[in-house]
Amino acid sequence: MPQTTSTPSPVIHRAGTNMRPSPEGIATASFLVESLVENGENGGLTAMRCALEPGVMTHWHTHPHGQILYVLSGVGLAERFGGPAEELHAGDCVSFAPNERHRHGAAPENAFSYISIQAAQDGSAVTWLEE
């Protein structure tokens, strides 16, 4: 008898169907987060789309395996601890090294949206630090 294998179906997240407010205490104000990929296993990728109003910045944080941000729209800022804030525009991509202290957010006069990709370790993909 021939052996059949089933091909897994793609997982599709329809835009805007999973938008929720960010957790409290991780930024200067709440912003919208849409989970795209959730895999909290060690080394498993997580991905989300974030939309920030003008001037909203995350607090300083790190990711155990680093982070990639891909800018969708608006003007944003990315800052490595001790370095200058770099302006980001649609189509830009920025990566942060594992455990590198950084923050990112919307420029003062512009909304900002991006996709972030990061891998988890011990069930967590981020460690939030001081403001």
Language model feature labels by segment:
Residues 1-44, 125-131:
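A short, N-terminal "cap"/entry segment at the start of jelly-roll beta-barrel domains
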Residues 35, 46-63, 98:
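Conserved short histidine dyad/triad with adjacent acidic residue
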Residues 41-44, 52-55, 75-77, 122-123:
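Short, charged/polar surface micro-motifs in flexible loops or helix N-caps
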Residues 45-47, 66, 112-114:
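Structural motif
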Residues 50, 69, 94:
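Conserved GNAT-family N-acetyltransferase fold
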Residues 57, 62-90, 100:
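A short beta-strand-loop-beta hairpin characteristic of the jelly-roll/cupin
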Residues 77, 85, 89-90, 98-125:
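Ligand-binding loop in jelly-roll beta-barrel domains
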